Amino acid sequence: MPFEQPLTAAPTSATPFRTSRPLRTGDVAPDNRLRFDGIARYLQDIASDNADAAGFGATDPVWILRRTVIDVHTPAAFPDRLHLSRWYSAYSTRWSNMRVQLTSDKGARIETEGFWINLNSDTGMPTRISDSTLELLATTTDESRLKWKAWLDQAAPAADGLPDAAFPLRSTDLDPLGHVNNAAYLHAVEEHVTARPDLLAAPHRLVIEYRAPITAGEHLALRRRDDDESSTMWFVVNGESRATARMARL
């Protein structure tokens, strides 16, 4: 199953982009665990830092996430210092898989991968990645025929089968495109995963896929289904599932 496939290893023939920073109290839960939304912010920050350092922030400035995979092998906990490595694990002419590994001074290990789509800043549609950025992507992978395949394609269950939980949006949840920010989706995930300490206690994988943006003024509801091995959440607006998240043991 796609959900269970392993992430690619770090390249041996090239050096990933690296940075480090302290684990901050604003990103941790009451038990000092680095929250999922905190991980999302670190991933966004290193993406921006990487774009600035490599120069493709000027040639390919607008990217959106279609999927994020977060594998928590050993969680990070405050206080600690995080070390982040970012490299390109596959690409095509309009999108790329970006791997980020988070380790720490105290032994944390979190492996992530994001499916990023390059957008035309005028039309908002997927567009061809510039030649210079394609050359950069090719420095850490030989996989140049990346195709999109959903990992979470299960439709949201009927509302009468599972009750919806309202999740009011705030102005601070929006990004420069007017969409709900990636980290804000994981605020909602955090609201529910604390009910599954059995999953959090073991190495676990969280996958979130975005189908359509959620914008200001829309009424977001969360629909959740649990079983012994996993927890799945649908982000529902007017009966339409805009995103799906699933957490399970690794």
Give residue spans per PLM region:
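HotDog/MaoC-like acyl-thioester-processing domains
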Residues: 2-7, 12-14, 69-153, 210-217, ...
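Hot-dog-fold acyl-thioester-processing enzymes
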Residues: 2-66, 113-115, 119-204
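Acidic/His-leaning functional-site neighborhoods
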Residues: 165-249
